[in-house]
Amino acid sequence: MSIITDVYAREVLDSRGNPTLEVEVYTESGAFGRGMVPSGASTGEHEAVELRDGDKSRYLGLGTQKAVDNVNNIIAEAIIGYDVRDQQAIDRAMITLDGTPNKGKLGANAILGVSIAVARAAADYLEVPLYTYLGGFNTKVLPTPMMNIINGGSHSDAPIAFQEFMIMPVGAPTFKEGLRWGAEVFHALKKILKERGLVTAVGDEGGFAPKFEGTEDGVETILKAIEAAGYEAGENGIMIGFDCASSEFYDKERKVYDYTKFEGEGAAVRTSAEQVDYLEELVNKYPIITIEDGMDENDWDGWKVLTERLGKRVQLVGDDFFVTNTEYLARGIKENAANSILIKVNQIGTLTETFEAIEMAKEAGYTAVVSHRSGETEDSTIADIAVATNAGQIKTGSLSRTDRIAKYNQLLRIEDQLGEVAQYKGIKSFYNLKK
């Protein structure tokens, strides 16, 4: 009765109006699952391949019909007849069917859509929530959210190199309260921006994208918003995080961090050592708890220096650096580079490999942050993954745009369903830092 009888993919649109995949999996029992695939703007060069058509006459070359066809004509034939509950076997079968190290033949977007849909169909068959199916009876930790309230870099037209300025309600007693704190700061920030005559339009991930005078202007404005909303900045209240997305402004030929790419003439151009110094200055000055991709994805020496300098005080998250891949994570652990991994399901392409990366991180004492992409959909699977794995942290955008709010609302539902069992760790989510 739990046997897969049909698999069907279609092309749909993501939050940026670009094509992506939606996959449906059907079983003999009538149990059904649907998965939608996100897409990134700033992508690591080692990520699994997102298959696009390249036909400029259709969706500016970004169509996904090839990936759709791969699901409907190749993957479907291979997995029809499998028990939908056998997630690992199905994921491994698709990896083998693709046969490339980066899923470049069938497309990670094709494979991931199926992987998510299979898991949802299995949960439907067993009549349990997705987070319970994926995580079992020990599922209980609601993630501390990283809320991206200011967008810069490749996510907006704001003249700031850092891609994301985030707030984290680490002092909140529950996820529900943490979400309220974040929403109130978001609205306080909007009011402050209006009073300064700055634009309150939002970027890809729902954060504001004003023309600040620089990084510190952005941080100072966030601190004012935290105060205006009635909260304190720090471990008992709300802390700040960056996604530097440094690979987006790293000049490989000159081996420098060229801030002029986003901030214009006169902006800083920093060596690897100077980049570390700059980040340390910011940490010394402001209540910063997490920095993502502070160094370029291939600047391993820079990462090691950054970790040596700040790794006991600040969460140093590898996104482009690790691309949710156990091979790169294992090297980072061995060489003491970073102390946390960002988990993006489409960087690696299957739920099985995603869970393996989270498990490896935890075993090494690294934290794991489950994350969205800048091109999102209404699919809320990552909310369930964050709870299923007790990851403790989630990064899923600002307090606007339904594609972001869908994940927060799902977490509110899960917190209600878990009842007294639910735990919100807040500052304790950063278990590998000396506080």
Curated annotation (Swiss-Prot):
It is found in: Cytoplasm; Secreted; Cell surface. Mg(2+) binds at D243, E292, D319. It catalyses: (2R)-2-phosphoglycerate = phosphoenolpyruvate + H2O. Binds a second Mg(2+) ion via substrate during catalysis. Pfam families: Enolase_C, Enolase_N. It is an enzyme of class 4 (lyase). Pathway: Carbohydrate degradation; glycolysis; pyruvate from D-glyceraldehyde 3-phosphate: step 4/5. GO terms for molecular function: magnesium ion binding; phosphopyruvate hydratase activity. Its EC number is 4.2.1.11. Keywords: Cytoplasm, Glycolysis, Lyase, Magnesium, Metal-binding, Secreted. One of its GO terms (biological process) is glycolytic process. Transmembrane segments: none annotated. Belongs to the enolase family. This is Enolase. It comes from Streptococcus pyogenes serotype M12 (strain MGAS2096). The gene is eno.
